[in-house]
A protein has these predicted regions:
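Repeated loop/turn-to-beta-strand initiation elements of outer-membrane beta-barrel proteins
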Residues: 253, 285-288
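Extended repeat-based scaffolds of very large eukaryotic assembly and lipid-transport proteins
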Residues: 29-243, 248-262, 269-273, 305, ...
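Long, contiguous all-alpha helical interaction modules
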Residues: 268, 273-274, 278-282, 302-319
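Secretory/periplasmic and organellar redox-cofactor proteins
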Residues: 291-292
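Short, solvent-exposed helix-helix connector turns and helix-capping sites enriched
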Residues: 8-9, 108, 215, 249-250, ...
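Bacterial Sec-dependent N-terminal signal peptides
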Residues: 1-36
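Alpha-helical structural elements of signaling/regulatory helical domains
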Residues: 188, 283-286
Length: 336
């Protein structure tokens, strides 16, 4: 064969292959947007104009209605699961990505596990709004907040929920040394226990709520050590300790409840909500006296109403402890 002819044929083959590669690349770039319906594109474009993700429908002190849930409903109805996965993983708007991920959670699709796994690698900041509260969070933590926010409403299989929880526990929180606390409520699975003990023995009081859930008598000394250090550090009742005792009101921890509550009410400004869990966990003369002080407090912004509302709600489904009964009958039951 003539060398020139052979050379021309080689160039022709290379040219054809190049066109095929470029063509397929172009196809992959346009394929996704071409697949989306007009309704889905409108919803997606709406998210692209959002500066924050609205977790709740009402936003701000005035409860201004956010339309983001409407956009989400439209996106959910006009996309497939595969399209939502692609949006959640690749969209240029992190607000749109979070919403696609949230929709996947509500659909309880197992592909949400891989979406969350990828999200945990992203530290770009994004703004979240819920009611009157707003915060700017790294994307990975925002993804955890979205999951936790909808938590009880999600119709996830036990296996999928456990997989997501474990991914967050080991893939984010353990890697971070639990520096931001637990961020969500974990069930006391055996698989977490060794890590929980390891963190507790390091003196990490952020782990207290989960450690208490195991209700292991062998952990009493370990928990008391953490409570003692926590009280010394905080000086008053802390969220971690309060949550731990709410999970396990063992008599061995009553000393903490008493000391923390007494220290808290000595503060010039405190919120009764912070100590009501502890007071009700240990019905005793000391807690009776503090509860009475709260219920009889005067002033426009007193803790009295907070205490009454808390007690009324708490004792809807359980008997009032005998020692609290006179206070309940006088200050709560008669005040409808």
């Amino acid at each position: 064969m003539n060398y020139l002819v052979l050379k021309q044929r080689i160039y022709l083959v290379i040219s054809v292959l190049t066109l095929i590669v470029l063509g397929s690349g172009y196809g992959s770039c346009t394929k996704f947007s071409d697949r989306l319906s007009d309704s889905a594109m409108v919803a997606l474009d709406s998210f692209h104009h959002c500066q924050y993700m609205a977790l709740s429908r009402g936003i701000g002190y005035a409860g201004r209605r956010s339309e983001q849930l409407d956009y989400a409903d439209q996106l959910s109805r006009h996309t497939t699961v595969e399209q939502l996965v692609e949006i959640a993983n690749t969209d240029t708007s992190r607000i749109a990505r979070l919403w696609a991920y949230r929709i996947l959670l509500k659909k309880a699709d197992k592909q949400v596990f891989d979406v969350l796994k990828q999200a945990l690698k992203d530290t770009t900041h994004v703004e979240l709004e819920s009611g009157c509260i707003g915060s700017e969070e790294p994307y990975n933590r925002a993804a955890i907040f979205v999951y936790n926010y909808d938590g009880n409403e999600l119709k996830l299989s036990n296996q999928l929920r456990f997989s997501l929880d474990s991914l967050i526990f080991f893939g984010y929180m353990k890697n971070k040394g639990f520096e931001n606390g637990l961020l969500m409520d974990f069930k006391p699975h055996k698989i977490y226990y060794a890590t929980v003990i390891e963190e507790a023995d390091k003196g990490n009081d952020a782990i207290l709520p989960l450690l208490a859930q195991y209700k292991n008598p062998n952990d009493r000394q370990r928990i008391n050590k953490l409570l003692k250090a926590n009280l010394k550090k905080a000086g008053v009742c802390s969220y971690e300790a309060c949550d731990a005792i709410s999970n396990w009101n063992d008599p061995a921890f009553e000393w903490y409840a008493k000391a923390a509550c007494q220290a808290t009410i000595k503060q010039e400004d405190y919120d009764a909500w912070d100590i009501l869990h502890l007071l009700c966990a240990y019905p005793a003369p000391w807690s009776y006296q503090i509860l009475k002080k709260l219920l009889t407090q005067k002033g426009d912004y007193s803790n009295s109403d907070t205490a009454k509302d808390y007690l009324r709600e708490r004792y809807k489904t359980r008997p009032v402890p005998p020692i609290f009964k006179p206070l309940y009958d006088r200050y709560v039951a008669r005040k409808k």
